[in-house]
């Protein structure tokens, strides 16, 4: 992820889900990255009790410095009716990555995550990372007997694609990743290993050299239904575009 961590981006996502059961498939802070989380209670009558749980690439609880205080992987807070909570993670220190789960009990939760990397004399760039509801590996939850997702990629003309996976289940996952070019020809494939509650992210060409100079479609098939997938398209000028997967 060192190449991805050098990319400058700001990410924001909002998805309204009753009781806020879901997750963010990629989070990062430190190493110049600042991360913000904002959770809104859309219920005008009921207080929401919210929990954010953070996990590292190996599925272990990830200590996080939230609002100046380090917590041991789990942060509990409440949101008043029609209220909101803003959480901040600093840009200083060593870069850290993983994924985060949001659960709210009572009220009606909506999640928002922000990442920013500020470079003096250069504009901030933006992209979107979604809050994914439980039971779906993508923002558009289309059920399938074997969970399968299609994600576009573009590594042509100086563009670069990064991809992230989050295993939100308590069992190991072994997703199969296949890359097809625009003619429909299979150019690369591999099976990944994700530990329980684990996470992985990488530039596509780091694991699939055949993707260099190509564009097409990434097909991800998972052996369990609780693997979230997300891709980011990095343009030559540093601008980031989120490539949301679609269920098949």
What does each model-identified segment do?
Residues 1-6:
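Positively charged n-region of N-terminal signal peptides that target proteins for export
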Residues 7-18:
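Bacterial N-terminal signal peptides
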